[in-house]
């Protein structure tokens, strides 16, 4: 169970970010930009990176939710397991290997990053902008993992599926008038979980 009384077993990140817009509105815009904005990285690749980083951090909510989003874009759940087992032996096209090695190192040992880590991505014919996109995704999900785990939000299969459906269809945009429609969204969420 979450650590705060305003949260419950079906809570997700929006139950944190939508309750404090002055703090979290910029993060929502950043999320939309890095996960759905222009990039050499496809949406499914970005979602797989998010799930991978989250799995490395053992954040059950973010792993489950972003794997569910990746599944909506036809990414197999087995692929995440393969990447966690051995990036180079996974069924992913090898051109992606340097990206996942970089994500692994930036997540597990960030102070050890060196020029060679960037050069490996560039040698695989990815652009410098893609490296920056990757840095933003990895950094953001390290933050989100700690935000969710710090609040005690673990999620469950139904929460992950709802997140997968919502994020694959609507992305990460949050309307400026969210405070006005949040009660309606909360009722819809309750109905979804009561079914």
Model-based region annotation:
Residues 1-195:
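Hydrophobic alpha-helical segments
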């Amino acid at each position: 169970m979450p650590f705060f009384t305003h949260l419950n077993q079906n809570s997700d990140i929006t139950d944190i970010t939508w309750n404090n817009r002055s703090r979290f509105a910029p993060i929502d815009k950043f999320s939309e930009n890095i996960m759905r904005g222009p990039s050499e990285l496809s949406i499914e690749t970005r979602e797989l990176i998010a799930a991978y980083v989250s799995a490395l951090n053992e954040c059950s909510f973010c792993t489950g939710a972003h794997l569910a989003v990746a599944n909506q874009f036809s990414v197999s759940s087995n692929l995440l397991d393969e990447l966690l087992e051995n990036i180079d032996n996974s069924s992913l096209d090898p051109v992606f290997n340097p990206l996942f090695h970089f994500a692994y190192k930036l997540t597990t040992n960030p102070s050890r990053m060196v020029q060679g880590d960037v050069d490996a991505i560039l040698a695989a014919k990815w652009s410098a902008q893609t490296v920056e996109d990757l840095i933003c995704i990895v950094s953001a999900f390290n933050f989100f993992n700690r935000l969710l785990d710090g609040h005690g939000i673990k999620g469950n299969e139904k929460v992950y599926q709802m997140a997968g459906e919502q994020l694959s269809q609507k992305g990460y945009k949050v309307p400026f008038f969210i405070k006005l429609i949040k009660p309606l969204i909360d009722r819809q969420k309750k109905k979804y979980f009561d079914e």
